[in-house]
Structures are given as structure tokens and as C-alpha cells.
Swiss-Prot record:
Entry's free-text remark on domains: The Asp-Asp-Xaa-Xaa-Asp/Glu (DDXXD/E) motif is important for the catalytic activity, presumably through binding to Mg(2+).
Tissue expression as described in the entry: Expressed exclusively in flowers. Expressed in intrafloral nectaries and in the funiculus within the ovules.
Catalytic activity: (2E,6E)-farnesyl diphosphate = (+)-alpha-barbatene + diphosphate; (2E,6E)-farnesyl diphosphate = (+)-thujopsene + diphosphate; (2E,6E)-farnesyl diphosphate = (+)-beta-chamigrene + diphosphate; (2E,6E)-farnesyl diphosphate = (+)-beta-barbatene + diphosphate
Protein name per its UniProtKB record: Alpha-barbatene synthase
Disruption phenotype: Does not emit any sesquiterpene volatiles except (E)-beta-caryophyllene, alpha-copaene and alpha-humulene.
Native source organism of the sequence: Arabidopsis thaliana
């Protein structure tokens, strides 16, 4: 693709200059040889059979052995190792769940029950939350004696976040655990440092809402300070994460080289967002495993294009210009590009360039059918971009529900999930894309959740720009409430949506677990992006911390 042409700065109004990328080209400096991967991979393969034998080779009729296996599966998940043992985990949990009543009949430890609950719900088994009733006293409240069990309280708090719309006991548990965990983390009753840190991490973002790469890195630091940790398991976790880091550095180098070759930065006007590292981080949220390295690269490139398109339409395009771009994308024909001018023409060329890359990759995989699905999802983004631009500038005021429905598509929710399924390789079959395009409840909820969280985070900035297409703004106008009242209501909606996501993942039986996990991982990405601040757009703070944790802080063997 040729270098981008200069944009018309005269049309630049109401927008302030954004800072240039803090990362620059530093990832171009890394040089990783194939032998670096080979050395770590050999060490990993030596340890895997030992871990497998320690965890999964036990008596299938021994209740205590089954409990121990389930608790060990929790360690595998938390340490980022479960993808090495998927078959063993599946078989063990299937067998254990068939005997679930007998398994927990005499169990009265909060930590054990909470962890078993978490593991089964993680893997799609509906274990009833009634199991927690045994921890209530005669007054119907949770027993105060539970507070002394720090790890039990933490695991109970983590279990709460697997709740559905009917798990009312977990709503009670949330208040109970929150009230006490904060003092266990930092107050006068503070736990040992490594446990306090784990509690603080959970209070910021619980494991079920956090992305797997961050959970693994944080949990490795916790686990090695546990007196009863398994040395073999810990070593495997450390080697595995170092192996992941090599892939991550290689991917960042590839994406940075691709972006540099296109020469975007030298010609971009001041409000176009340069987000090479941020888009890679967003892709990492969808899958962290090494076998999906190409998928992360493909996803990061799509996010760069979506960001570029969003800036072109929201910031620089007049309604007529955005209409012309949407029309060209609808036709998907390069011959119509001559009808476009300046930045709209460049945006169209950028889209065509990326999808040509996709076409070549998918053809080599024998999966050309995916391209048609991806093109359709991208056309939807273009249509919804136009719709929101018209609402923001044309005077039409949509209802809150109408805006949320369109806004979820415009922000790229469906295209993001589709791209992540594309990156799964052979796992991403035609049926998965047809399921996504049918817009099941799970997917629609994720679109709405994205729109809500993004608009809550960016409300002040949107209003400063004069950009009125914002969920808070529409809710305030429709219901005649203050910003604070609207914020509380939207936060409540977001909490309810989390429960629906959990509920739908337990209900859906027609899709492979890995496909559903892409939806779960997408939901997790929203919490990571927006819990502290808008990580994608505000690069200081949490993003810097996350990148340091994932790529800079050493893991000592």
C-alpha cells in the first residue's frame, strides 16, 4: 500500500492534538531466533508429563482425589497452563460432575466449595449456587466466622462473578465478601503481602473478568510465595510464560514493521490515533495461547483499520463524505474509489489493503468462506458509522435503545468477535460465523455492553468535542435525569449484562466451548479496557502497567 496522502487540516475543528505513540519503534529492536523458542519448548515438553501424572492419574472412585484434581485444574487455569491439558480437563470434569452431589455431600470448607463452583462454571457446567446455603446461619445471613478464612473469602468473592440473573444468593455474597476483603487487603487485618496483592488484584478486576495473560502473570507471582506450591508446576508455569513472551515480542515487531511500512504516522493529522501496541494488546485479550499468534496479528491489524475508519468518520468526515465512503464499502469495489477524496479515499484503500492480506491467508488455509463473512461484518460497521455521524450532526435524536443497538455494531463488537474466530484456524468453522451473524442474545448483549462502557468512559471527552452521540447523553434526555443518576443506571445495566453473559454461556450447547470463549474473552477485554480508565485511548496509567507486567518484569527460574 502506498504511503497515506496528507489530509485536509482546514476541516480539523473542535479536536485537540493527541500525543504520539509512547512506544515508538522500540519493538523493532528485538531479535528472536528460532532456537530461543526451541530451547523453551523442549523444557516445557519434559515437564508436561510430570504435571499430567501428578494431577490426572488418580483413582476415579476416590472422592478426595477428584476434589484434588478439580482444585489442581483451578491452578492450571490461573497459571495459564490449561491449554496444554484440555483433553484431560474435559474428561476429568465430565466424570466428576456426574458425581457432583456425592462429591460435595460432606464438604464444608468455603475455599473448596467456592473453587469447585468456579471450575465447573468456567467449563460450562451448571453447578447450583444453592451449595453456598450451608455457609448461612439461622438468621439467614452468612456466618461471621467465615471472615477468618481469608483464602475462602477470596475464592467466594471470585465465585460470585459467575452469577446469573437467578443466582440471588451470589448477590448477597458480593456485599458480604466486599465488606471484608478490603480490610484483609490493606487494613489492620491485612494478610501476608502475596495474599494481600492477590486480593487487591481481585478487587480491581476479578479473575473471571480479567484476561488470561494478566491473570497468569499475576498468579505466578502469588503461587511461588505459597509455602505448599508444587515446584514442577511452578517451573512449568514460568517456562510457559517466557515462551509466550517470545511470541508476544515477535508479534509486536511484526505489527510495528507493518505499520511503519505503510508510513501512516508521517502523514496523519493530529487527531488520528496511532495505536499499534494498543491494538496488539486488544488482540491478546481475545486469545493468549501461542498457537493463535497469527490470529493476534490479524486481529491487531483489523483494530488499526477500525480505529482509522472511526477517526476518519467521527472527526474529519462530513455527512456527505461518510455517505460516500459507506457506499463504496457497501459495493466493495476498488473502481468506485475515485468517488472519494482525501482521508476517506485513504481509509477505503487501507480497508482494501488489509482484506487483500486476509484473502491470501485464508486461501492458503483452505478457508476462503471466512472472507465473505468478514466483509459483511465490516460493511455493517460502515453503515452504523454513517448512522451515528448523522445522529451526532444531523439533529436526529434516537431513543436510548435504538442508539445502543446501532452503537454496539458501530464500535466493532461483532467484527472483533468474527476476526477472533477467523484467527482460531480450523476451529473457526462456517457454523460459528453463521451463529455469530444470527446475533444470538449473548452477542447482542456484548454489543450493548461495549457501547455502554465506552460511552461512560468517554462522556466528558465527547461532550467537550461537541459529539452528542453518547449513551449517557441519550439516557439523560430520554428520562430527564442528571448525569449522576444516568451513570448509576447504566452501571446497573452493565452489571446485569455480566450476569446474562454468564447465563447464556451455560445455556448454549450448539457451539464448541472455544467459540463461546471468544465471547467470554471479549467481555473480559471490556473490563480490562474500561475498569480503571479508557486504556485504549489513555495510554499512561494502566496500559503502561499491564505492558510492564507482561513484557518487562522478569520471571526468575
Amino acid at each position: 500500500m502506498e504511503a497515506l496522502g496528507n489530509f485536509d487540516y482546514e476541516s480539523y475543528t473542535n479536536f485537540t492534538k493527541l500525543p504520539s505513540s509512547q512506544w515508538g519503534d522500540q519493538f523493532l529492536k528485538f531479535s528472536i531466533a528460532d532456537s530461543d523458542f526451541d530451547v523453551l519448548e523442549r523444557e516445557i515438553e519434559v515437564l508436561k508429563p510430570k504435571v499430567r501424572e501428578n494431577i490426572f492419574v488418580s483413582s476415579s472412585t476416590d472422592k478426595d482425589a477428584m476434589k484434588k484434581t478439580i482444585l489442581s485444574i483451578h491452578f492450571l487455569d490461573s497459571l495459564g497452563l490449561s491449554y496444554h491439558f484440555e483433553k484431560e480437563i474435559e474428561e476429568s470434569l465430565k466424570h466428576a460432575f456426574e458425581k457432583i452431589e456425592d462429591l460435595i455431600a460432606d464438604e464444608n470448607k468455603l475455599h473448596t466449595i467456592s473453587t469447585i463452583f468456579r471450575v465447573f462454571r468456567t467449563y460450562g457446567y451448571y453447578m447450583s449456587s444453592d451449595v453456598f446455603k450451608i455457609f448461612k446461619g439461622d438468621d439467614g445471613k452468612f456466618k461471621e466466622s467465615l471472615i477468618e478464612d481469608v483464602k475462602g473469602m477470596l475464592s467466594f468473592y471470585e465465585a460470585v462473578h459467575f452469577g446469573t440473573t437467578t443466582d440471588h444468593i451470589l448477590d448477597e455474597a458480593l456485599s458480604f465478601t466486599l465488606n471484608h476483603l478490603e480490610s484483609l487487603a490493606t487494613g489492620r487485618r491485612a494478610s501476608p503481602p502475596h495474599i494481600s496483592k492477590l486480593i487487591q488484584n481481585a478487587l480491581h478486576i476479578p479473575q473471571h473478568r480479567n484476561i488470561q495473560a494478566l491473570v497468569a502473570r499475576e498468579y505466578i507471582s502469588f503461587y511461588e510465595h505459597e509455602e505448599d506450591h508444587d515446584e514442577t508446576l511452578l517451573k512449568l508455569a514460568k517456562l510457559n510464560f517466557k515462551f509466550l513472551q517470545l511470541h508476544y515480542f515477535q508479534e509486536l515487531k511484526t505489527i510495528t514493521m507493518w505499520w511503519t511500512k505503510l508510513d501512516h504516522t508521517s502523514n496523519l493529522p493530529p487527531n488520528f490515533r496511532e495505536r499499534t501496541v494498543e491494538t496488539w494488546f486488544a488482540a491478546l485479550m481475545m486469545y493468549f495461547e501461542p498457537q493463535f499468534s497469527l490470529g493476534r496479528i490479524m486481529s491487531a491489524k483489523l483494530y488499526l483499520v477500525i480505529t482509522f475508519l472511526d477517526d476518519a468518520c467521527d472527526t474529519y468526515g462530513s455527512i456527505s463524505e461518510v455517505e460516500s465512503l459507506a457506499d463504496c464499502l457497501e459495493r466493495w469495489d476498488p473502481d468506485y474509489m475515485e468517488n472519494l477524496q482525501g482521508h476517506m479515499k485513504t481509509a477505503f484503500k487501507f480497508v482494501m489493503y488489509l482484506f487483500k492480506e486476509y484473502e491470501e491467508i485464508l486461501r492458503s488455509q483452505g478457508r476462503s468462506f471466512v472472507l465473505e463473512k468478514m466483509i459483511e461484518e465490516f460493511k455493517i460497521i460502515a453503515r452504523k458509522n454513517l448512522e451515528l455521524v448523522k445522529w451526532a450532526r444531523g439533529g436526529h435524536v434516537p431513543s436510548f435503545d435504538e442508539y445502543i443497538e446501532s452503537g454496539g455494531a458501530e464500535i466493532g463488537t461483532y467484527a472483533t468477535i468474527a476476526c477472533s474466530i477467523m484467527g482460531l484456524g480450523e476451529i473457526g468453522k462456517k457454523e460459528a460465523f453463521e451463529w455469530l451473524i444470527s446475533r444470538p442474545k449473548l452477542v447482542r448483549i456484548l454489543g450493548a455492553k461495549t457501547r455502554l462502557m465506552d460511552d461512560i468512559a468517554d462522556f466528558e471527552e465527547d461532550m467537550e468535542k461537541g459529539y452528542t452521540a453518547n449513551a449517557l447523553n441519550y439516557y439523560m434526555n430520554e428520562h430527564g435525569v442528571t448525569k449522576e443518576e444516568a451513570s448509576r443506571e447504566l452501571e446497573k445495566m452493565n452489571g446485569d449484562m455480566n450476569k446474562i453473559v454468564n447465563e447464556e454461556c451455560l445455556k448454549i450447547t450448539t457451539m464448541p466451548r472455544r467459540i463461546l470463549m471468544q465471547s467470554v474473552n471479549y467481555a473480559r477485554s471490556l473490563d480490562v479496557l474500561y475498569t480503571a480508565d479508557d486504556v485504549y485511548n489513555h495510554r499512561e496509567g494502566k496500559l503502561k502497567e499491564y505492558m510492564r507486567l507482561l513484557l518487562v518484569d522478569p520471571i526468575l527460574l
